[in-house]
Amino acid sequence: MNSGPKVSVIMGIYNCERTLAESIESILSQSYKNWELILCDDASTDGTLRIAKQYAAHYSDRIKLIQNKTNKRLAASLNHCLSHATGDYIARQDGDDLSFPRRLEKQVAFLEKHRHYQVVGTGMLVFDEFGVRGARILPSVPEPGIMAKGTPFCHGTIMMRASAYRTLKGYRSVRRTRRMEDIDLWLRFFEEGFRGYNLQEALYKVREDSDAFKRRSFTYSIDNAILVYQACRRLKLPLSDYIYIAKPLIRAFMPAAVMNRYHKKRVMNQKEGLVKHE
């Protein structure tokens, strides 16, 4: 039986000096207290490492700080965190996002009660420099078919059983999955026959600035299309789903301003009753 923390929160951090302290404070403020936070600095070039060191020194019993000697990107950083994690449950958080106080409490309670689920996600509020723009609430029980159309879980919100992460061997750190390590993870997750659940309330805040779509290259869109194709083939989805392979390619040719307007409309187009947070 694990005598250490029940939950390991893993956070890959890179050049997030403006937001890191607030993100860490949101974990320190959790109503659920049996956790450890593992930070992996990915060779930051700003003040991120200095801030992380301050928190790790002040909360040495709760916060572990590890470092990549060179910049290896998010998947490698998360795997580095996983190699140091001791919890039965692994929770994700990004260094520019926030968790509401009862997030960990509610996710632990769900996994303790529902042993047949390997992961539990939550809804999330989307915010930028101007405030909250909307919410994203995904289906409560996503089926493999969702992989052709979009993501089954909001990656930053998840809590997964450590045993499931071990079975999946963590994240694949290869060029094809850069910035899509979560999509690749969910493809392998469904291939393994695992099941997940999304709590129908927003317990997380994700920061999406106005330049989010300017940073997505055509190469990214090609790799995204390849992953959609692999999902259709490996999960044996119906032929009608193959049309979604074109979706990331179409988006690649859309002006960033158009994509931002579409995205803003999409996140705002949620049922108001679903946007609960505690």
From Swiss-Prot:
- Enzyme Commission (EC) number: 2.4.-.-
Q: What induces it?
A: Repressed by SinR.
EC class name: transferase
InterPro entries reported in the protein's UniProt record: Glyco_trans_2-like, Glycosyltransf_2, Nucleotide-diphossugar_trans
Q: Which Pfam families match?
A: Glycos_transf_2
Q: Which GO terms describe its molecular function?
A: glycosyltransferase activity
Q: Does the keyword Glycosyltransferase apply?
A: yes
Q: Which UniProt keywords apply?
A: Exopolysaccharide synthesis, Glycosyltransferase, Transferase
Asked if the Swiss-Prot or TrEMBL record annotates the protein with the keyword Kinase, the reply is no
Similarity-based family? Belongs to the glycosyltransferase 2 family.
- Name of protein: Putative glycosyltransferase EpsE
- Annotated organism of origin: Bacillus subtilis (strain 168)
